[in-house]
A protein has these predicted regions:
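Helix-adjacent hinge/juxtasegments
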Residues: 68-91
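Vicinal oxygen chelate
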Residues: 20-25, 83-130
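Short beta-strand/turn micro-motifs at beta-sheet edges
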Residues: 2-5, 66-72
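Long, contiguous binding/interaction regions
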Residues: 6-7, 37-46, 62, 87-90, ...
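N-terminal beta-strand motif that seeds the catalytic metal site of vicinal oxygen chelate
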Residues: 2-27, 82, 141-151
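Short glycine-enriched loop/turn motifs at secondary-structure junctions
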Residues: 10-12, 75-79, 119
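Core segments of cupin and vicinal oxygen chelate
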Residues: 17-64
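Glycine-centered tight beta-turn/hairpin loop motif at sheet-sheet or coil-to-beta transitions
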Residues: 55, 130-132
Length: 151
């Protein structure tokens, strides 16, 4: 049963967990990234860390050695990518020029761009974490399927 207890939306994703090949490297990466995006550290241990903001959390854990042999690839069965909200196109552009480029974080598809086939005004930059998990920072002024609703 889903309870409606305030401003958290029914069915909203509560948390995501990434299993990393090198916890320390990934934890450092996500600590900087998520702090920049407004998350705060809620847990940090030698093989697991979590960051959160009201209503949802993001976790990173160390992969067990027996599962690490094949590594991650977004075209295999499983998660393809994770997208974070941006409040404007300017935020996406600043994130790209002030964060991704100076840190030499691998950027995909040549940098920020419009993706109108997703929805009107969709503007995003795609990049990779240390295990090549595809991440996205997206400004989405109109959500597909909700064009007539206020979003």
């Amino acid at each position: 049963m889903i309870l409606d207890e305030g401003p958290i939306m029914k069915g909203q994703i509560y948390h995501v967990e990434i299993i990393a090949s090198n916890f320390q490297k990934s934890a450092e990466f996500y600590e900087e990234l998520l702090t920049r995006l407004g998350y705060r550290t809620i847990f940090y241990d030698k093989e697991e860390a979590g960051w959160g903001m009201k209503g949802h959390n993001f976790w990173v854990s160390q992969c067990k050695e027996k599962f690490a042999l094949n590594g991650y690839h977004r075209k295999r069965v499983g998660v393809n990518h994770i997208a974070f909200h941006a409040d404007s196109r300017k935020t996406v552009d600043q994130f790209y020029t002030e964060y991704l480029q100076p840190k030499r974080i691998p950027v995909l598809y040549g940098g920020p761009k419009e993706n109108p086939w997703y929805s009107k005004g969709y503007y995003a930059v795609y990049f990779e974490d240390p295990d090549r998990v595809k991440l996205e920072l997206a400004y989405v002024p109109v959500f597909r399927g909700f064009e007539r609703d206020s979003c």
